[in-house]
Design a protein with these regions (language model features):
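Conserved MFS/SLC helix-loop-helix module at the cytosolic interface between two early adjacent transmembrane helices
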Residues: 66-102
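Structural signature of the two symmetry-related core transmembrane helices
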Residues: 82-96, 297-312
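Hydrophobic core of transmembrane alpha-helices in multi-pass small-molecule transporters
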Residues: 106-121, 322-337
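Cytoplasmic helix-loop-helix junction between adjacent transmembrane helices
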Residues: 111-146
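Intracellular juxtamembrane helix-capping segments at the cytosolic ends
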Residues: 121-134, 336-350
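Helix-loop-helix hairpin linking two adjacent transmembrane segments in secondary transporters
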Residues: 141-190
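Transmembrane alpha-helices of Major Facilitator/SLC transporters
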Residues: 271-294
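A late C-terminal transmembrane helix in Major Facilitator Superfamily
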Residues: 343-386, 394
Length: 433
């Protein structure tokens, strides 16, 4: 049986609420990268070592993962209309705390926790809101919004940090102002669309009779990724999603520091752009159709992720910026496909509330992988040196990718005979046999 969700009413209030929710979620993701180009500055100003910088960067994941897991198991998603304003307000307070952290370094950690909390609270809530407002067209929003937010947030943070004064303050101030404006639009949307996702009003899915049902497909936009059954518990898909987010975290949270530490370049702008190319290319690849029309299988994106990061590590060991850049570009293409396709596979046919919960679980797992990889990279760099630590984590990443691909292929073999559900398909299958 195929489950389809009808889109919400197309009135102005619904559009305003959906728009404010979507833009706010993207801005929250942007805020998660505000600190990225500032890490070398914190290392110089506060005397942080590689491990301390990695822990500071990864502190964001702690609150994020805990809240996402609570959202997936508890009633938070059913209170989307309350959770979203709290999420946006938390992001604003986190920015203010991190501004003060320029003078009091210990405050950077609770500020980073608040940033993670804001992303976590908005993740499931925005997913539910977008599906309720836009129907199936909103189902792919989480992957698209995450990639857009990560890419644009990093670009903006780099430009502000390099070209504007008071870099440890200005980045957060700009983000806080943008979030405040979006919060105002969100309140206006909530008032204009009082019935959309009101408590205890999960939209009733449209059930299509089995004999008339299409083969279930994970809607990613222009392309339907065909699956034979629900993959909401597919470990391979979850692991590919974690690898996709981990490569972005490693590229922007670890690689620029490694480039500067090894003397491959002494330019903050160059180091950030080489590492940040992963997220920037990921965002552009998303618009170019990666995960939509090309590279739409989990083994393909898993292979790209492993290949990309292996090339980047080889470039770091050789001291060649162009090789590192090639690796981060390939990894960015893999990230765009990996996160989007994996999320599409595990959320096929879900209602808005189910979508929010599964998306929250998936995001928690993906961010867990990113946080673990970044912390391990920092610890390995502290113990074995910059190059030795990077090579160690590169091997761990490649092995994990191989395991993920193996799990996906094993699942695919078990479901190699798809069910033919439409009469016309049965006739075609009989003719072919």
């Amino acid at each position: 049986m195929t489950v389809k969700v009808a889109a919400g009413r197309g009135d102005a209030g619904t559009r305003l609420l959906a728009g404010a929710s979507g833009v706010g979620f993207i801005l929250a993701i942007c805020g998660s990268n505000a600190m990225t180009p500032l890490l070398p500055g914190y290392m110089d100003r506060h005397g942080f070592g590689p491990a301390a910088a990695a822990v500071l960067f990864a502190t964001y994941f702690v609150a994020l993962i805990v809240i996402l897991l609570i959202s997936a198991r508890g009633p938070l998603i059913r209170h989307t209309r309350t959770v979203l304003p709290i999420a946006f307000l938390t992001a604003i307070v986190g920015d203010l705390v991190e501004i003060v952290g320029a003078w009091y370094p210990l405050l950077l950690f609770p500020g980073r926790l608040m940033t993670g909390a804001s992303v976590a609270l908005s993740t499931g809530a925005a997913a539910a809101m977008m599906v309720a407002a836009r129907g199936e067209r909103g189902r792919a929003f989480m992957a698209t919004g995450s990639l857009i937010g990560a890419g644009t947030g990093l670009i903006a943070a780099i430009l502000i940090a390099v070209y504007l004064p008071w870099q440890l303050v200005t980045v957060y101030a700009v983000h806080a102002v943008a979030m405040t404006i979006c919060l105002g639009f969100l309140f206006a949307g909530l008032r204009a669309a009082p019935d959309l996702l009101a408590p205890d009003r999960d939209p009733v899915p449209t059930v299509v009779e089995p004999e008339l049902a299409d083969v279930p497909s994970a809607h990613t936009g222009d392309l339907d990724v065909v699956v034979e059954s629900s993959r909401s518990r597919d470990p391979g898909a979850y692991l590919v999603g974690a690898l996709a987010w981990a490569i972005g975290a490693l590229a922007v949270g670890a690689m620029p520091n490694a480039i500067l530490a090894t003397g491959i370049s002494d330019s903050l702008l160059v180091a950030q752009c080489v590492g940040g190319a992963c997220l920037i290319v990921s965002m552009l690849a998303n618009f170019a159709g990666v995960g939509l029309r090309v590279i739409t299988t989990l083994p393909a994106v898993g292979s790209l992720l492993a290949l990309g990061w292996s090339i980047a590590i080889a470039g770091l060991a050789m001291g060649r910026l162009e090789v590192i850049l090639l690796g981060t570009v390939i990894g960015g293409i893999g990230q765009a496909g990996g996160y989007r396709v994996a999320l599409a596979y595990i959320t096929v046919g879900l209602t808005p509330i189910q979508q929010g919960r599964v998306a929250a679980t998936f995001s928690a797992f993906a961010y867990s992988g990113a946080g673990v990889m970044v912390v391990l990279d920092g610890v390995a760099g502290q113990l074995a040196g910059t190059i030795g630590g990077a090579v160690t984590i590169g091997v761990v990443y490649a092995v994990t990718s191989a395991i993920a691909i193996g799990l996906v292929l094993r699942r695919t073999r078990r479901t190699a005979q798809p069910a033919v559900t439409r009469p016309v398909d049965r006739e075609t299958a009989d003719t072919a046999s």
